[in-house]
Amino acid sequence: MERITVTLGERSYPITIAAGLFNEPASFLPLKSGDQVMLVTNETLAPLYLDKVRGVLERAGVNVDSVILPDGEQYKSLTVLDTVFTALLKKPHGRDTTLVALGGGVIGDLTGFAAASYQRGVRFIQVPTTLLSQVDSSVGGKTAVNHPLGKNMIGAFYQPASVVVDLDCLKTLPARELASGLAEVIKYGIILDADFFTWLEGNLDALLRLDGPAMAYCIRRCCELKAEVVAADEREAGLRALLNLGHTFGHAIEAEMGYGNWLHGEAVAAGIVMAARASERLGQFSSADTQRIIALLERAGLPVNGPCEMSAQDYLPHMLRDKKVLAGELRLVLPLTIGKSEVRGGVSHEVVLSAIADCQQA
């Protein structure tokens, strides 16, 4: 069992990583006998894990209710959020309740925002079941729902009480979802850790076949990097913005194409290549490094071009609603070398449009 701490003073919390955690009541820190829980999951995961997690919590003396939501990015909405509030109020659950998010990024983000909002804040625990949520979205306290005009536009910074990463969940993950998570994994190497990127080049095949030791190391390293960044910059005033490499372009794809048509990691993968192309055009990133990124993304089964249905101009309205925009000026996360990146303002629309055009599908 691996345990990593996200260090935030009194709000510090553990990330527990191992196989078989759903069999151990002690995994679900800080729950104890007599606590009340609302377990939030979706229609796809409920048949796989709901009874197992409910059973282990009930054996520990925890009182468990549950709400099952529809599955998909398109349901990360205010309407579905209200379903969680209604379930909490009907029981009823008070301020001493704990929400448990059993699912991927959609369930984690939505449940976290419900916890931040319900009765002005209740405790919640992240139990991520996808690679993407295990390495990224479950750690750091970003919670949100989408708006038709933009992704994650309605939300809050609200840290979980703990994160429980059961590696066995990856055995039921569809191949497309595994690839989507690998986009965020590869991102960490590009922005923060050149050695990790090189390790990924040598071990990607092992990850694709769900090799246990390789996957455990991969998830641990990503969580270590994320925990370090969050501890240094919880509310994204500077360093944490680097974690958004590819996301300004990627969120534009998700919003324009309709939430759920492109998986988040797929859109981010294409966005990473667009960011690399923009950095190339600014003379600060080598074409050789861009090709290394493209090669690794393609080996993971990820797109390296944007959707053919979108023109370069279609991206800009969405990008200008990005949360990093200041005083109407676009700010992009751009790679400088493999393992180092920056947030750069003042990038001309011409450079942005040219970078997107470089990545248009035929």
Curated annotation (Swiss-Prot):
Pfam families: DHQ_synthase, DHQS_C. SUPFAM superfamilies: Dehydroquinate synthase-like. It catalyses: 7-phospho-2-dehydro-3-deoxy-D-arabino-heptonate = 3-dehydroquinate + phosphate. Keywords: Amino-acid biosynthesis, Aromatic amino acid biosynthesis, Cobalt, Cytoplasm, Lyase, Metal-binding, NAD, Nucleotide-binding, Zinc. CDD domains: DHQS. It is an enzyme of class 4 (lyase). One of its GO terms (molecular function) is 3-dehydroquinate synthase activity. NAD(+) binds at residues 71-76, 105-109, 129-130, 142, 151, 169-172. Its EC number is 4.2.3.4. Its cofactor is NAD(+); Co(2+); Zn(2+). Pathway: Metabolic intermediate biosynthesis; chorismate biosynthesis; chorismate from D-erythrose 4-phosphate and phosphoenolpyruvate: step 2/7. InterPro entries: Dehydroquinate_synthase (IPR050071), DHQ_synth_AroB (IPR016037), DHQ_synth_fam (IPR030963), DHQS/DOIS_N (IPR030960), DHQS_C (IPR056179). GO terms for cellular component: cytoplasm. Zn(2+) binds at E184, H247, H264. The keyword Cytoplasm applies. It is found in: Cytoplasm. Binds 1 divalent metal cation per subunit. Can use either Co(2+) or Zn(2+). HAMAP family: DHQ_synthase. Catalyzes the conversion of 3-deoxy-D-arabino-heptulosonate 7-phosphate (DAHP) to dehydroquinate (DHQ). Belongs to the sugar phosphate cyclases superfamily. Dehydroquinate synthase family. This is 3-dehydroquinate synthase. It comes from Salmonella typhi.
